[in-house]
Amino acid sequence: MEISQLLPKFKIEKIIKEWLEEDIPSFDYGGCVVGSDEKVAHLLGKQNGVFSGSIFFQEIFNQLGCKVIWFIKDGESFSMTHGPEKNKPQVLAHVIGPVRNILIGERLSLNILSRSCGITTQGYNVKKLVDGDNEQQQQQPWKGKIAGTRKTTPGFRLVEKLALLTAGLDTHRMDLSSMIMLKDNHIWACGNITNTVKNARSVGGFSLKIEVECRNQNEAIEAIEAGADIVMLDNFNPQDLQTVSTYLKQHYPHITLEASGGITSATIIQYAIPTIDIISMGNLTQGVPHIDISLKIQKQ
């Protein structure tokens, strides 16, 4: 199964068209200078990473009348040491077409890929930690899911969520319409957890799950007994998380438990315990280092 098939073609076409129009609102001065002779450009991975975002790159150059020849697939690793020559960038793809069109798509395509690959690389490395591929591995592999959050870049969410999926992670909810998440402000506005969940169920019906953010065991119990499907245990330390989640699973085995709040790659192992089903991390999409990727026209 190809993850990129999640995105309808018309949606991709619309997004890319808007981004291209944003970059060239009127004259293409640089393109006029170089002309329209056919050239070949190499897409180069200049540091270690895990690749993602090909569907966006491909659509950019489709709209610009260029051909892309791929040498890597989404989810595959690339590095500077690939092949017989050391410290040489790995060639990820060739782009063939009118030189002015290649240059139109250059910066937009690289902005997307460097961000997308950065998120996928970060997610892949975090997933390895809980999969037991390192020295910190716990005695038994954790069977839960690592998820992102809604802390995404406005207008760029599809790229970032697809990058998480490519890393083997969960997107969490895509938007406010995907699942009902009741946080502290919702609860304070409604007065208590029970009323908040009741109101949410009356508008969400049977088809939408309800998740409630809880700060302690009593709040979690109230949320469960009010009919929540998922309880987020927010900003718990590992010891308290172990105690509370164990109690909740013993008394309410049907409930899905999520740990969230301040969890990083340095601490995730402490939160990956059997009674936790989901670990969500905002830093999977916020503050992620970009991967250095370039597109170079080849001299003839």
Swiss-Prot record:
One of its GO terms (cellular component) is cytoplasm. GO terms for molecular function: nicotinate-nucleotide diphosphorylase (carboxylating) activity. This is Nicotinate-nucleotide pyrophosphorylase [carboxylating]. CDD domains: QPRTase (cd01572). Pathway: Cofactor biosynthesis; NAD(+) biosynthesis; nicotinate D-ribonucleotide from quinolinate: step 1/1. It is an enzyme of class 2 (transferase). Gene3D superfamilies: Aldolase class I, Quinolinate phosphoribosyl transferase, N-terminal domain. The keyword Transferase applies. SUPFAM superfamilies: Nicotinate/Quinolinate PRTase C-terminal domain-like (SSF51690), Nicotinate/Quinolinate PRTase N-terminal domain-like (SSF54675). Quinolinate binds at R107, R150, K151, H172, R173, K183, E213, D234, S260, G261, G262, G282. Its EC number is 2.4.2.19. Residues 5-9 are annotated as: Important for hexamer formation. It comes from the Eukaryota. Hexamer formed by 3 homodimers. Signal peptide: none annotated. Keywords: Glycosyltransferase, Pyridine nucleotide biosynthesis, Transferase. It holds the Pfam family QRPTase_C. It catalyses: nicotinate beta-D-ribonucleotide + CO2 + diphosphate = quinolinate + 5-phospho-alpha-D-ribose 1-diphosphate + 2 H(+). Belongs to the NadC/ModD family. InterPro entries: Aldolase_TIM, NadC, NadC/ModD, Nicotinate_pribotase-like_C, Quinolinate_PRibosylTase_N_sf, Quinolinate_PRibosylTrfase_C, Quinolinate_PRibosylTrfase_N. It comes from Dictyostelium discoideum (Social amoeba). The keyword Glycosyltransferase applies. One of its GO terms (biological process) is NAD biosynthetic process.
